[in-house]
Amino acid sequence: LSTVEPAKSPSESLKNEETDSLTSTFILLRSIWCTLWLSFLTMVDVSLRKAGREVISPRVKLWAQRLLKYADVNYVVHYEKPWSIEPGRRYVLMSNHRSYFDIPLVLAAIPGTVRMIGKQELFKVPIWGQGMIAAEFVPIDRNDPKNSMKSLTRAKRLMENGVLIWLAPEGTRSPDGKMQPLRKGGFLLARQTDAIIIPIGLRGTETVMPPTGFKINAGKYLSVHVGTPVDTALLSRSEKRELPLRITEELKKLSGEI
């Protein structure tokens, strides 16, 4: 589940020199081209050929792996406790959010059919947005409660069909690497579906692409820390109310903040 074992730790990669502007621009343009091309293919396959997840899911993985390869990114996955996907159960993956590179990292590193709930603005990007919708990614308007509930309903339907839903409960990228207050939508989704929450700590993605700007620094070593699953079906009412605090502390630990 991991790529080549890194020669340096994620913390050591912080000391690497930044990639020069020309190389960074080349990586960015290559990534954009790959994104647009695979998005276009997905739109065509879904709308004209009625392609299903057996076609689209490997393509999502391919896209994620290519973006990491273009940036010469290596990563390793650590499991706090081994787990496997139980047929018939619903899963909500929750991670910290420091960079746009969180997206390809999670999609490449986590097994199974993973789809993201993302802010609506991403889905307005021409071609990419339509490609994500065709691939069953779920847009959410954080400023419109009614539409947000529709998005959660759509996510529920995907979960009922074996899709693992991933979201960053902070709602946006952290400007300083520290956890921001978690939004309630993901926890509502987990409680309503008796889902198993998988906390995931992402380390080092902000060194590849900082939260401000689009410069890409190549050659970084990242790590994904998968925490102990939390089965919401086994929690009491009081424990469910404490879930946001519990997951906040878990994500801080897994992401290396504490």
Give residue spans per PLM region.
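Non-catalytic C-terminal accessory region of glycerolipid acyltransferases
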Residues: 1-21, 149-258
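Membrane-anchoring hydrophobic helices of lipid-metabolizing enzymes
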Residues: 3-91
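Catalytic core of membrane glycerolipid acyltransferases/transacylases, capturing the structured
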Residues: 38-50, 57-58, 62, 70, ...
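Hydrophobic alpha-helical segments typical of transmembrane helices
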Residues: 55, 63, 102-105, 118, ...
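Generic preference for hydrophobic
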Residues: 77, 93, 116-117, 224-226
